[in-house]
Amino acid sequence: MAANVPLSDFLATAVDAAKRAGEVIRKGFYVKKNVEHKGQVDLVTETDKSCEDIIFNCLKQQYPNHKFIGEETTAAYGATELTDEPTWIVDPLDGTTNFVHGFPFVCVSIGLTIGKVPTVGVVYNPIMNELFTGVRRQGAFLNGVPIHVSSKDELVNCLLVTEVGTKRDKSTVDATTNRINGLLFKVRSIRMAGSCALDLCGIACGRADLMYENGYGGAWDVTAGIVIVEEAGGVIFDPSGKDFDITVTRIAASNPLIKDSFVEAFKQAE
């Protein structure tokens, strides 16, 4: 079916779904939330669940034969294997902790893989009214305006974004803080804003120069952002310098000029 449908049609459907879910997020942002715990610091709200339903219903109406992977359905029913079939991979509310605290760095993330390749990406922050889109070989955009990664070529001039994840065992926390400590001597500054998808979009539009995350939640965190970064001229890779593998939950992104320097700095900080 994917071979007979223009990618622009997939994009339009994803944008529609993201905006519908985004309206629910926007309305829920300013009211008291009913919060559940998936882990010590990993939260989920009724908004996460209702937004996933909205998105999947919208997508399934148009593409009933496609496959679907979502953060909340995966948490409830277990992982779904990624195949070569057209597959929609959805995080209905990336940045749930931010949402709960009223910090406006939240988004809907909708990605489509075809042949396991991220092909269409939509990331929508309804609080800041920013819509990032990308289609393979067709460019990346913020609210319809073309975007491009930065041109920084020295680490000392770079802004690095990362996340600390949700694991709080001592070995993970020590490794995370030691790594950040080492990298902080190499770059201009470091930011942690609480949304992997929006971190990737920050690389795509040049707000930040480097991004990495060890142990992100799942493919729903990165699929859409990968398309947007690559279409904005950026590169996606494993922080070790190896090729990116979506099943390993390690990701890095940058402009092509700074990748090698970052990989070397990352190895030294490990």
From Swiss-Prot:
Disulfide bonds: none annotated. One of its GO terms (biological process) is phosphatidylinositol phosphate biosynthetic process. Pfam families: Inositol_P. Its EC number is 3.1.3.25. It catalyses: a myo-inositol phosphate + H2O = myo-inositol + phosphate. Gene3D superfamilies: 3.40.190.80, Fructose-1,6-Bisphosphatase, subunit A, domain 1. Mg(2+) 2 binds at D91, D94, D221. Its cofactor is Mg(2+). One of its GO terms (molecular function) is inositol monophosphate 1-phosphatase activity. Substrate binds at E71, L93, D94, G95, T96, G194, S195, C196, E213, D221. Belongs to the inositol monophosphatase superfamily. Responsible for the provision of inositol required for synthesis of phosphatidylinositol and polyphosphoinositides. This is Inositol monophosphatase.
